[in-house]
């Protein structure tokens, strides 16, 4: 049996529960044909780079599959028939990744939030210094002298 990574996109107006039901149905197709699905990851709703069948967003789902080619072909055939599935892509791999995929790791990184206040200058222009940290020169000195007289 061969190892595959399979990603499919489902229309955005389908509920998350219906996406799970679709994933379970396609997983059942693989298992009925002598294969196994070792990992199912729901990546959630993401924006598409371009419109696919008049949709700008889609539910993304990943399968890690260990199955014969006939099982994967049958699953792809059924996905092609299903109106809710916008696109799918199956890639044969030498070994399956353990742990969360790169997309889930990216989402975890994005969920960390702000980094907060930094102890040093904070970067950017000026390094956190105000103009009062250095002596005035030229035109600035003249403006400062007129400000102090009022």
Swiss-Prot record:
GO terms for molecular function: small ribosomal subunit rRNA binding; structural constituent of ribosome. It comes from the Bacteria. InterPro entries: Ribosomal_bS6, Ribosomal_bS6_sf, Ribosomal_S6_plastid/chlpt, Transl_elong_EF1B/ribsomal_bS6. Keywords: Ribonucleoprotein, Ribosomal protein, RNA-binding, rRNA-binding. Residues 99-150 are annotated as: Disordered. The keyword Ribonucleoprotein applies. Residues 105-118, 128-144 have a biased composition (Basic and acidic residues). One of its GO terms (cellular component) is cytosolic small ribosomal subunit. Transmembrane segments: none annotated. CDD domains: bS6. One of its GO terms (biological process) is translation. Belongs to the bacterial ribosomal protein bS6 family. NCBIfam families: S6 (TIGR00166). HAMAP family: Ribosomal_bS6. This is Small ribosomal subunit protein bS6. It comes from Azorhizobium caulinodans (strain ATCC 43989 / DSM 5975 / JCM 20966 / LMG 6465 / NBRC 14845 / NCIMB 13405 / ORS 571). The gene is rpsF.
